[in-house]
């Protein structure tokens, strides 16, 4: 299956093409982008370039994520570049229409660290020391596409995120991609005894921000079961599962491939642990019928405020412990190492990227991962 590039790469290519027009008053058909991660140069087709004024230009590219079931496939990405004030910040990056806003970060544009680095690195080298530019990224279809994503669950509204830790987009649901994840795991298992599994980019990004060693992070996508078994077979001593609660809690129900097309079980896991914690029948029913895990968490938080109880901690601590024990059982059932099987801990975070709970094992593992 063919890989492609992530959205930040196309945004950067458009900005390079628009800046070229400002300098040369000429269009280019291909922009060369240094991906940084990985260390390679991408040749990105430019669909259109136009001067909007003497000091402003627009370039358009189209997303090509490869053979990936990605809703951004073929969506246009616009980059508007204008000259800034002499002596100002060399590259100022803004989010325009269709770029999401982070509701818990003063509505900042959802242009995350890799995209920022990519744009800064590629554009700064094209500027003289005294020059500065303002780059505005626009996704004309971003607002409508965002409705079909889980962005709002992570506090991003009104558009898509320029998210990612690499310039390469891989087909995450394909067996070939599992092979790629296993290959990365095999490499890191040869270097470290303790590793962190993250399902997606939000986990990878937050893990770095709380001080976890980036070299110990391994992306799993939805393939948690096979990756846990592989880690155990490789002799990894400790695995920390670090992820969004709406994904990781599925493991507490014995679901080890977390794609929603295969199985869900979130409301059953939540309602069961609420019942075990002693919530009222009425509150258990509200949790069970909540449309999302985030809505259920919101109800538990409201209960804590109104009653002075600590239901969030009680329920989620129990879920985290169940995740740990289910993972241990799963690995041991596939392991030839017996009681020496890999130790597993879990950390769950919410849509605001705030940690809800760390299991007891996770707390013990953290010292080996930072």
Swiss-Prot record:
InterPro entries: CbiD (IPR002748), CbiD_sf (IPR036074). GO terms for molecular function: cobalt-precorrin-5B C1-methyltransferase activity. It comes from Nostoc sp. (strain PCC 7120 / SAG 25.82 / UTEX 2576). Pathway: Cofactor biosynthesis; adenosylcobalamin biosynthesis; cob(II)yrinate a,c-diamide from sirohydrochlorin (anaerobic route): step 6/10. Belongs to the CbiD family. Its EC number is 2.1.1.195. This is Cobalt-precorrin-5B C(1)-methyltransferase. One of its GO terms (biological process) is methylation. It comes from the Bacteria. Keywords: Cobalamin biosynthesis, Methyltransferase, S-adenosyl-L-methionine, Transferase. It catalyses: Co-precorrin-5B + S-adenosyl-L-methionine = Co-precorrin-6A + S-adenosyl-L-homocysteine. It holds the Pfam family CbiD.
């Amino acid at each position: 299956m063919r890989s492609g590039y992530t959205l930040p790469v196309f945004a950067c290519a458009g900005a390079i093409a628009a800046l070229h027009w400002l300098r040369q008053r000429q269009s280019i058909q291909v922009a060369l982008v240094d991906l940084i991660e990985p260390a390679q140069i991408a040749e990105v087709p430019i669909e259109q370039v136009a001067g909007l004024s003497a000091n402003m230009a627009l370039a358009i590219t189209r997303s090509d994520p490869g053979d990936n079931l990605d809703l951004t496939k073929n969506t246009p990405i616009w980059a508007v570049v204008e000259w800034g004030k002499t002596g100002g910040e060399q590259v100022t990056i803004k989010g325009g229409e269709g770029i999401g806003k982070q509701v818990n970060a003063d509505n900042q544009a959802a242009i995350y660290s890799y995209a920022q680095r990519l744009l800064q690195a590629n554009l700064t080298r094209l500027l003289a020391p005294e020059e500065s530019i303002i780059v505005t990224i626009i996704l004309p279809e971003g607002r409508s596409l965002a409705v079909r994503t889980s962005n709002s669950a992570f506090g991003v509204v009104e558009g898509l995120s320029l998210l990612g830790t690499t310039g390469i987009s891989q087909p995450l649901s394909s067996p070939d991609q599992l092979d790629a994840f296993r290959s990365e795991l095999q490499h890191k298992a040869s270097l470290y005894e303790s590793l962190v599994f993250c399902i997606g980019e939000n986990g990878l990004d937050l893990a770095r921000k709380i001080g976890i060693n980036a070299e110990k992070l391994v992306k799993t996508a939805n393939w948690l079961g096979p990756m846990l078994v592989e880690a155990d077979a490789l002799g990894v001593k400790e695995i920390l599962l670090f992820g969004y609660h709406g994904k990781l809690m599925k493991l507490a129900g014995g679901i080890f491939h977390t794609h929603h097309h295969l199985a869900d079980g979130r409301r059953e896991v939540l309602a069961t642990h609420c019942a075990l914690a002693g919530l009222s029948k009425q509150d258990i029913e509200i949790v069970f019928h909540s449309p999302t895990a985030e809505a259920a968490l919101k109800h538990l938080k409201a209960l804590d405020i109104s009653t002075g109880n600590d239901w969030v901690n009680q329920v989620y601590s129990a879920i985290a412990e169940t995740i740990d024990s289910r993972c241990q059982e799963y690995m041991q059932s596939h392991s030839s190492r017996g009681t020496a099987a890999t130790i597993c801990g879990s950390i769950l975070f919410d849509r605001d990227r705030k940690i809800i709970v760390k299991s007891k094992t996770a707390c013990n593992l953290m010292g080996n991962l930072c």
